[in-house]
């Protein structure tokens, strides 16, 4: 089962909050310290974890205490070289570099330079490097395979930075949100709630933003922010395994499950390509794939392709769509569907065995459907009408289960 981490961020996200939540969830501080020493950072520092209360809620506050006040300003190439030379686990190395690369892209767009020319200030400091690499170490230690994140609060007010007094959210954070079209909202708190480091971690590592995915919750971690706020300043980390179904209590009408719906409109793919794509999506694990004829702009005839899949299959389905079709954009949303309990039975007909799909309450099933492929094979072999085979199989099941 896929191991999932979900960052629940009602008061935002920062690198040290991620570290605090991971330590609170069971990542040993000693492990982080040992691994981070491999970075050979020139500035002496201490990694300190402290149990704290935020509005009466217990959490772990992690702080990178720098022994020397000035901090180094580094370019992306310097940081990448540090990480690559550290001998970290492969996933940690790749994740950490990806976070800094994403941050460099955002900073470059803000300042009108290339990512290679970006001169990191706060995020090139020792504490930011420790926060980012430490977070990746913690996720790797817990065996996390997929990261998700809630919508993020915008915050407000101003903050002092290397470029002077900046309004919140700061430009780099806004650009990071824009790159991933992160859902944001105001919770009314006038303070910096999402730092560039926290935004870069979320934007780079999270597969999607919004409600939690379907998972069986195993543990939680609570990471404290630096300040007391009107609501508990906590990042809540949920750890669990991907669950195929998130169900309400059983009802005669079946159970609810959360699914992901992906849609795209295409007007320049052949029917053969669309059929092939549908096969690929179903083979990947999509629950349903269907198409509808539509009229697009300028009166063009097109196809609306819709995919329904489990939330943790979204990324894989998106990869297939972008690779195999001409689409340049996708829409997606979470929905719920109600599913009847289902099982497969077998019945013996005069011509051989037929599988039967039964849906509904075991004592009073609502639908009984003979398997088409079995009936088709018999009909072709025996030269008997298909509908007759289906009727006989259904009647046989009714007799055996009367």
From Swiss-Prot:
The entry's keywords: Nickel
InterPro entries assigned: Ni_insertion (IPR002822)
The keyword Lipid metabolism is assigned to this record: no
Protein's UniProt keywords contain Nucleus: no
Gene Ontology MF annotations: lyase activity; nickel cation binding
HAMAP family named in the record: LarC
Protein family (similarity comment): Belongs to the LarC family.
Protein name, per record: Putative nickel insertion protein
Source organism of this protein record: Synechococcus elongatus (strain ATCC 33912 / PCC 7942 / FACHB-805)
């Amino acid at each position: 089962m896929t191991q999932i981490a979900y960052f629940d961020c009602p008061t935002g996200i920062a690198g040290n909050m991620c570290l605090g939540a991971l330590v609170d969830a069971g990542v040993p501080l000693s492990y982080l310290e040992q691994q981070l020493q491999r970075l050979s950072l020139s500035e002496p520092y201490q990694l300190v974890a402290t149990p704290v209360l935020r509005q009466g809620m217990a959490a772990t506050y992690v702080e990178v205490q720098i022994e020397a006040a000035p901090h180094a300003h580094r370019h992306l190439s310097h940081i990448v070289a540090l990480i690559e030379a550290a001998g970290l686990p492969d996933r940690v190395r790749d994740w950490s570099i990806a976070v800094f690369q994403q941050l460099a892209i955002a900073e470059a767009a803000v300042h009108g330079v290339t990512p290679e020319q970006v001169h990191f200030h706060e995020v090139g400091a020792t504490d930011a490097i420790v926060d980012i690499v430490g977070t990746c170490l913690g996720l790797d230690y817990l065996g996390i395979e997929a990261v998700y994140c809630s919508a993020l609060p915008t915050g407000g007010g101003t903050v002092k930075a290397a470029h002077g007094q900046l309004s919140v959210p700061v430009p780099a954070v806004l650009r990071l949100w824009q790159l991933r079209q992160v859902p944001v909202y105001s919770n009314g708190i006038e303070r910096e709630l999402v730092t560039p480091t926290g935004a870069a971690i979320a934007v780079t590592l999270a597969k999607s933003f919004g409600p939690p995915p379907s998972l069986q919750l195993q543990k939680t971690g609570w990471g404290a922010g630096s300040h007391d706020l009107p609501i508990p300043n906590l990042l809540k980390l949920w750890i669990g395994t991907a669950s195929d179904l998130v169900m309400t209590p059983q009802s005669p009408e079946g159970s609810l499950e959360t699914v992901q719906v992906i849609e795209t409109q295409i007007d320049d793919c052949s029917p053969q390509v669309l059929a092939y794509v549908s096969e690929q999506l179903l083979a990947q694990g999509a629950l349903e794939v269907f198409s509808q004829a539509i009229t697009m702009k300028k009166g063009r005839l097109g196809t609306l392709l819709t995919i329904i899949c489990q939330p943790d299959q979204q990324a894989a389905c998106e990869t297939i769509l972008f690779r195999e079709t001409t689409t340049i954009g996708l829409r997606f949303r979470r929905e719920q569907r109600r599913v009847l309990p289902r099982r497969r039975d077998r019945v013996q007909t005069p011509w051989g065995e037929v599988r039967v799909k039964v849906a509904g309450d075991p004592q009073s099933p609502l639908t009984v459907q003979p398997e088409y492929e079995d009936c088709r094979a018999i009909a072709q072999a025996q030269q008997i009408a298909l509908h007759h085979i289906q009727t006989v199989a259904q009647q046989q099941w009714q007799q055996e289960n009367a």
